[in-house]
Amino acid sequence: MYIDNYLIMRKINMEETILSLTSYQLRPGKVDKKQFVLLIDVSSIRSYKVINALEDYFVNGKNRKEICDNHKINQGYLSLKIRELQDISLRIYNISHCI
């Protein structure tokens, strides 16, 4: 009985996570500047170069290659930081729906 309940709860949690991932993601060029600044504030990202690159991506909608060339950062590193900000945004979204 306990295992069945655990598996059911795990399935529900996985479905909620998938729903959250699809219904709330930061989209390039669609993030409000104020929301972006708040996300950066709660993140561990402190490099101005990386912050400006992320702003170009999320707020201004520029493509990754152009951003990396302009800000002199590695595409792989930019991808990691994009993922980091996406993860923070998802956590905040999930917290806000638990209240």
From Swiss-Prot:
<dbReference type="InterPro" id="IPR053721">
    <property type="entry name" value="Fimbrial_Adhesin_Reg"/>
</dbReference>
<dbReference type="GO" id="GO:0006355">
    <property type="term" value="P:regulation of DNA-templated transcription"/>
</dbReference>
<keyword id="KW-0804">Transcription</keyword>
<comment type="function">
    <text>Trans-acting protein involved in the regulation of the biogenesis of K99 fimbriae (FanC).</text>
</comment>
<dbReference type="Pfam" id="PF03333">
    <property type="entry name" value="PapB"/>
</dbReference>
<keyword id="KW-0805">Transcription regulation</keyword>
<keyword id="KW-1029">Fimbrium biogenesis</keyword>
<protein>
    <recommendedName>
        <fullName>Regulatory protein FanB</fullName>
    </recommendedName>
</protein>
<dbReference type="InterPro" id="IPR004356">
    <property type="entry name" value="Adhesin_operon_reg_prot"/>
</dbReference>
<keyword id="KW-0614">Plasmid</keyword>
